[in-house]
Amino acid sequence: MVNQPTKKTEVFLSLGSNIDPEKNLKYACRELKKAFGNIQISSVYRNKPIGFEGNDFLNMVVKVKSSFNPNEMLDFLGRLESATGRNVGTGAFDSRSLDIDMLLYGNLVHQEKPFQVPRIDIELYSFVICPLAEIEPDGIHPISGKTFKDLWESFNQEEHPLNKVSLKV
């Protein structure tokens, strides 16, 4: 009997940190490479925190191809966050050693707990849509049907300004 290759799904992840961000983003990318092999990485962007006072965040988007189902992916990402000292009990608007959100899981549309894809953050925050449009400009949002490039170009970029930073991860 021949083993069938496991089908892999394209998964897009948003990574952010404002506590030792250079170290934590490098750690996350290293672990993602170990787990998934070849990954695609956006530029890194600096932005002010939204909804609270704190250090600037560094944010990026990473594309992986995974045989994990969505729940397995969430468990894996939670372990990466915990390894950097992230306290999962912190509020939505708080400093973070590492925050990894699953933005897209293939073309899956799932809007119930424990996860939502596509994640609404794609259309709300420049630090999500800008790097996503950078690495997948012609990708199609599974609900709106718009390309990520079009979503970024129509985004109010003055409301959430970003600065690209030079960081090798």
Q: Where would I find each of the regions flagged by the language model?
A:
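Short N-terminal secondary-structure initiator segments
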Residues: 1-6, 67-77
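Short, surface-exposed acidic-centric catalytic microdomains
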Residues: 27-73
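Flexible, gly/pro- and Lys/Arg-enriched active-site loops
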Residues: 47-57, 71-74, 79-169
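Short beta-strand-to-loop capping motifs
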Residues: 15-17, 62-68, 104-107
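Amphipathic, positively biased hydrophobic alpha-helical segments used for protein targeting
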Residues: 25-27, 62, 117, 156
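N-terminal beta1-alpha1 ligand-phosphate binding loop
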Residues: 2-35, 42-48
